[in-house]
Structure formats: C-alpha cells, structure tokens
C-alpha cells in the first residue's frame, strides 16, 4: 500500500545525503583555494626574505627591520633564532653556555609551528576524499531500494515508476565522486607542496644555524 509518511521519510534521508555531499564539495573547494593562495604567498614571502637575508645586510639590522611580528614563515623562523641569540648574550657581551643548542631548538619549534599552519585543513580533504564515495554509495543503494519499493507498490516496471529512484541513485553516485575526486587530487598535491615548502624552512634554519655557529666560534 502507498504510505505517504514512508515517502516523506525517504525524501528526507535522500535530501540529507545530497546536502552532505554538496556541502562536502563546497567545503573541500574552499580549503583548496585557501591553501593554494597560502602556498603561493608563502613562496613569494620566502623568496623576498631570502633576497634580503643574503643581501649582506647585518643580521641585527634585518631583525630590527622585521619587527616583533614579522610577516612570512621564513622570517618568523629567522626571528625565533635571533630572539634566542639576543637572549643568550650576557650584559658584558659574552654568550651564555649552550646558546647554540637553544637557538637550534627555538628554530625547530618555529619550523614545526609554520608547518602546522601550512598543513592545517589537509586532513579534512583526506577525510572528504575517503568518505564521500561511501556516502554517495549509501545514496545509490537508497535510490535503488526506493525504485524497487515503487515497483512493488505500483505493480509495474514502467520507466515512469523506476526512473525517479534510479535517477536519485545516479545523482548520489555523481555527487560522491564530485566531492571525492578533487579532494583526493588536491590533498596529494598540497601535501607534496607543503612538504617542499617546509623542507625549505628546515634548510634555511640549518644554514642560519651554521652562520650563528661560526660567530659563536669566532
């Protein structure tokens, strides 16, 4: 028998599945565009800072020019090292023992902090990429099940009876793939990009540590 309440429940579940998939797609694209812009800015800032750092300008002058809250990930790594460098000086100008180790640890912490900033949100892309196909599969099964229920109720296999349920099933499949495929592709790309950028920060920290080590030994 035809049950209007059952039909309403079916439509409610279908709508929730579709909303989840569409929302996941918009969420993933917002993260993708945000990260692409962030990575482009990070590369530009790193390039500009490298030019200033290797220009021959005294490090203390560069540090003062950057200020207490420098813009740019590499600049913040540099500032963290310089802050510890200045803290390690006694009033008579002599370096406190263990300065090199403290400077290295300070920059290591700064690199980790900048890496977390770059990589935040990427786990959401991974989650969407792995779960959206299964949510879409649930919608597919739900649509096919509704199509069979309609066949049983109408006692007919007419296309007009079967088509709505099949259309819902195909739409759920498509939306699941639409949400998952870009999320997976850009998760892999952005993860690789962030690894390369962070490797640049680590390389700079090592080079800067070497420079400070020479000054400590001189």
Where are these regions (language model features)?
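Single conserved hydrophobic/aromatic residue that forms the stacking wall/gate
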Residues: 1-9, 13
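Transmembrane alpha-helix/interfacial motif
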Residues: 14-57
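N-terminal membrane-entry
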Residues: 14-18, 117-126, 168, 172
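Residue-level signature of catalytic and energy-coupling elements of molecular machines
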Residues: 15, 29, 62, 78, ...
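Alpha-helical transmembrane segments of multi-pass membrane proteins
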Residues: 30-41, 178-193
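Predominantly long cytosolic amphipathic alpha-helical stalk/bundle segments
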Residues: 43-135, 146-158, 185-218
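Hydrophobic positions within alpha-helical transmembrane segments of bacterial inner-membrane proteins
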Residues: 130, 137-144, 173, 177-185
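Hydrophobic alpha-helical transmembrane segments and adjacent short intramembrane/lumenal linkers
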Residues: 155-169
């Amino acid at each position: 028998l035809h049950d209007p309440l059952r039909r309403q429940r079916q439509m409610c579940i279908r709508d929730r599945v579709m909303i989840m998939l569409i929302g996941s797609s918009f969420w993933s694209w917002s993260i993708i565009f945000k990260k692409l812009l962030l990575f482009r800015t990070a590369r530009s800032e790193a390039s500009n800072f490298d030019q200033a750092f290797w220009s021959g300008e005294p490090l203390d002058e560069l540090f003062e020019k950057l200020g207490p809250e420098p813009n740019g990930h590499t600049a913040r790594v540099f500032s963290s090292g310089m802050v510890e460098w200045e803290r390690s000086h006694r009033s008579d100008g002599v370096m406190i023992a263990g300065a090199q180790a403290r400077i290295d640890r300070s920059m290591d912490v700064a690199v980790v902090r900048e890496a977390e900033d770059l990589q935040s949100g990427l786990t959401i892309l991974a989650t969407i990429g792995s779960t959206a196909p299964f949510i879409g599969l649930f919608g597919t099964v739900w649509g096919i099940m509704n199509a069979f229920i309609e066949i049983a109720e109408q006692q007919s296999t007419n296309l007009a009876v079967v088509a709505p349920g099949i259309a819902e099933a195909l739409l759920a499949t498509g939306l699941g793939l639409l949400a998952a495929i870009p999320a997976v592709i850009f998760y892999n790309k952005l993860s690789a990009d962030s690894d390369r950028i962070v490797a640049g920060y680590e390389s700079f920290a090592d080079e800067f540590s070497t420079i400070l080590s020479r000054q400590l030994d001189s």
